[in-house]
Design a protein with these regions (language model features):
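Active-site mouth loops of central-metabolism enzymes
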Residues: 26-38, 86-97, 214-224
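Beta/alpha (TIM)-barrel catalytic core signal, keyed to glycine-rich beta->alpha loops juxtaposed to Asp/Glu
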Residues: 5-13, 33, 120-286
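Short, charged beta->alpha transition segments
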Residues: 69-73, 98-108, 158
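Acidic-and-aromatic substrate-binding clefts and catalytic sites of carbohydrate-active enzymes
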Residues: 33-38, 53-65, 90-97, 123-128, ...
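N-terminal binding-site loop/beta-alpha segment at the start of enzyme catalytic domains
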Residues: 1-83
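Structural motif corresponding to the early beta-alpha repeats
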Residues: 74-96, 120-121
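A structural motif
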Residues: 48, 111-114, 168, 240
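Active-site groove signature of glycoside hydrolases
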Residues: 105-127
Length: 286
């Protein structure tokens, strides 16, 4: 996998990306938390085949995606081989090592297995290396059907280490218009040719809503990016292969698909969004 120097077009939901050496192929759009089970169906119909579910923290907030996956698979067992389901645990060792991902399997009829094991909220060496070891052993043993492992990073230096040493099949990082520090201490250190993808989370955390914009008393002629423009901001970076997103309702899936068709932002638009977010979320997070 070679990252382009400049992105000419944004990824589409129907595209597929290989997860490391797992043999699994995922859409660049990964669906996470949602209020409506119908959102899962709409995402699948739009080409999304990658889903993100929690195994512990925020369990009630993922009820919509669990029910949506159950509905997607009900009466259509062949669909199970078309989708990739990742389950994240935010527990540290020794609890993490128990790998209680089977609870999600039991909660979603037809799920049968967890394709991707994810260590959540990696913030230190202690929360990373022991969990990587546990996941690698589980992957080697095919525990709960696992074929791939990944992590969500709060400490970017560890994301660099994991990429340079091919420790994971996927990594999730945090980059947005109020949190642009990855430009300085992460993206320059990623190899141009990678064996595993980089996905982003918290892409819209930096949104300046119309109400926030109005309170700034800026000229009416200034651009007010909509929520999907924040995904465009993230995916404009060629180092990022996909995004974890949380559309609450089916129509938001279509809105995202249409937004991605607009293509990448210009450099001026990127800088404008960073500036605008800094006015509301000041000081700008690095």
């Amino acid at each position: 996998m070679m990252a382009p120097a400049v992105r000419q077009a944004l990824p589409k939901a129907t595209d597929r990306i290989t997860l490391g050496k797992s043999g699994l192929h995922v859409s660049p759009i990964c669906l996470g938390m949602t209020m409506s089970p119908e959102t899962v169906i709409a995402a699948y119909d739009a080409g999304v085949n990658f889903f993100f579910v929690t195994g512990d923290l925020h369990w009630p907030m993922y009820d919509g995606i669990r029910k949506g996956l159950a509905k997607l698979l009900d009466g259509n067992p062949s669909r199970r081989d078309e989708v990739v389901v990742g389950v994240v645990s935010y527990l540290d060792n020794p609890l993490f090592a128990a790998l209680q991902f089977h609870e999600v399997i039991g909660e979603v009829p037809g799920l049968q297995r967890v394709d991707l094991l994810i260590a959540g909220a990696v913030s230190s060496d202690q929360s990373f290396y022991p969990r990587v070891d546990a996941m690698a052993r589980a992957r080697a043993a095919g525990q709960n059907g696992a074929r791939a492992i990944g992590a969500t990073f709060h400490q970017r230096s560890l994301a660099v280490v994991s990429e340079q040493y091919d420790m994971l099949d996927i990594r999730f990082i945090r980059y947005n218009s109020a949190h642009p520090g990855a430009r300085r201490d992460l993206f320059p250190y990623f190899r141009s040719v990678r064996t595993s993808p980089v996905f982003n989370f918290k892409s819209t955390m930096s949104q300046v809503t119309p109400q926030m914009f109005e309170a700034l008393n800026l000229p009416k002629s200034y651009w007010v990016p909509d929520v999907c423009d924040y995904y465009r901001f993230v995916l404009t970076r060629p180092e990022i292969d996909g995004v974890l997103c949380s559309p609450m309702h089916p129509e938001e899936v279509q809105q995202l698909a249409r937004a991605l068709e607009k293509g990448p932002l210009t450099r001026e638009e990127e800088e404008y969004m960073i500036w605008l977010s800094s006015l509301v979320h000041a000081p700008v997070l690095t």
